[in-house]
Every structure is written in structure tokens, then in C-alpha cells.
């Protein structure tokens, strides 16, 4: 089962990740956005509980899990009448629309049309959203997937204020140096991630955790005391940084 939402992460190490996380594991995932990694895990006999502090993202995924046909049908109905100019305007105010089904449909449409796979940003191309994709969305079935809205944005509070799980998963994506001390709150749909705070928080915890990054030499340096698996563009493990696309870090 594939996620209806695209992610700029484009994580290649799915097979390796499933070797690390055993079947029947309870996995708590943080920084939910596209659900690509989480849905892949839950469709392979793992229970995934995904956390986000962004209400629009929580709302979309709650509805996508419980009413996928309703959202997809709404998107199918409104998309033909949305000009490219209207879509650009909706990038700025989609989250202010009153109808939650309409908001969820816009979340889906804008993400699929954005060349950056974002909802609130990116150059738009209507041709990126195909009827086949929307038809598949109607059939989305993710029974082993649950989404939780975290009231706190403090990472330490969030990871110490939830159920007991076997593994905590942190799909981060890009390591943005300019985000370290910028104080940015991210976008309406994606969380701001302070990389230093994440490292400091995980270093102090005893539970099993997995962190996923796109390749950056700073990630290798920062997590040098932990288990690092480098993944090439084919999804295979590599020992060569020149061939590395993604990084999997574990403390177990």
C-alpha cells in the first residue's frame, strides 16, 4: 500500500529498515507528514503510531485513514475547476477553509501538484495529479496505522508522554544547517526539526530508536558513536559515502 502523499525525502532504505524493525513490533513515529515510510511499515505486519504537532497534518491523516473515499471523491470533484492561479492562492490559505473534507482534499491536491512535494509551497503543475492516483487513494486501507496529535512541541515532553513501544522512529529527511538556530516553526503541514535538540534528546534516552536522514557528512560525524547504515540509491547497504543516499542510525 502506497501513501497518497508525496515526500521530498524519497527514502530508499525501506527493505533495510524492515530488517531492523522486526515483524509484530509496535513502532512510534514522529514528525509525520507524507506517511510514506510509516504506511510501508504498517502494511508489513507492524503497528505504527505516528505523532505530529501540526493539526492540519493530523486532520488529513485521521480522515485519510477513516474516510479515504470521501476525501478522494472531493478531490476528484473540485480539481477540474481549479486553475493554476487558484492553486497558487490555495497554497497560502488552504488551511483556513472551513470544511474539513475540503481542507483534506486541498492538502492532497496541492501536495501532488507541487514539484517540491509540499502543500504550502513549491512550483505547481496540474499534470502531476493523475486520476489513477486519486482512484488508488479511494481504496486506501491502513488498519495498523494510528495518528496522534501531540499538544506539546517540545520533543522531550512528547517522547516521554506516550505509550510503551518497541521502537521510536524519527524520519527526519534533509539535514538543513540553516535550521539549527533559525527558530523556524516549519510550515502549516510540516514540523520544524532542531537537529541538535533531536540528537541531545535521543542521546539521553534508553529506549530503542531509529533516525532516518538524507546523506550529509554532518550526520555521520554527529552520530559517530551509534550504529550507522549507509544506503545507496538502489536501497542497498554501502560502505562508500560517495554512493550514500540515505542514512539509518540506531542505538541498538
Predicted regions and their residues:
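Short, polar loop motifs at secondary-structure junctions
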Residues: 32-36, 132-136, 213-217
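Conserved SAM-binding loop
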Residues: 61
Amino acid at each position: 500500500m502506497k501513501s497518497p502523499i508525496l515526500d521530498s525525502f524519497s527514502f530508499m532504505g525501506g527493505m533495510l529498515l524492515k530488517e531492523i524493525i522486526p515483524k509484530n513490533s509496535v513502532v512510534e513515529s514522529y514528525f509525520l507528514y507524507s506517511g510514506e515510510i510509516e504506511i510501508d511499515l504498517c502494511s508489513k505486519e507492524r503497528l505504527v503510531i505516528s505523532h505530529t504537532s501540526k493539526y492540519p497534518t493530523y486532520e488529513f491523516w485521521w480522515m485519510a485513514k477513516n474516510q479515504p473515499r470521501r476525501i478522494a471523491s472531493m478531490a476528484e470533484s473540485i480539481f477540474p475547476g481549479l486553475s493554476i492561479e487558484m492553486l497558487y492562492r490555495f497554497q497560502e490559505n488552504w488551511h483556513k477553509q472551513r470544511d474539513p473534507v475540503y481542507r483534506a482534499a486541498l492538502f492532497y491536491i496541492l501536495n501532488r501538484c507541487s514539484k517540491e512535494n509540499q502543500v504550502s509551497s513549491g512550483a505547481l503543475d496540474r499534470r502531476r495529479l493523475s486520476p489513477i492516483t486519486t482512484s488508488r487513494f479511494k481504496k486506501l486501507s491502513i488498519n495498523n496505522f494510528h495518528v496522534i496529535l501531540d499538544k506539546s512541541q517540545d520533543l522531550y515532553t512528547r517522547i516521554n508522554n506516550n505509550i510503551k513501544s518497541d521502537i521510536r522512529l524519527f524520519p527526519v529527511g534533509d539535514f538543513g544547517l540553516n535550521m539549527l538556530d533559525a527558530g523556524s516553526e516549519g510550515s502549516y503541514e510540516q514540523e520544524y526539526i532542531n537537529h541538535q535538540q533531536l540528537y541531545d534528546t535521543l542521546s539521553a534516552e534508553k529506549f530503542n530508536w531509529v533516525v532516518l536522514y538524507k546523506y550529509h557528512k554532518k550526520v555521520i560525524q554527529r552520530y559517530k558513536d551509534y550504529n550507522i547504515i549507509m544506503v545507496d540509491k538502489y536501497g542497498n547497504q554501502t560502505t562508500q559515502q560517495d554512493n550514500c543516499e540515505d542514512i539509518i542510525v540506531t542505538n541498538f
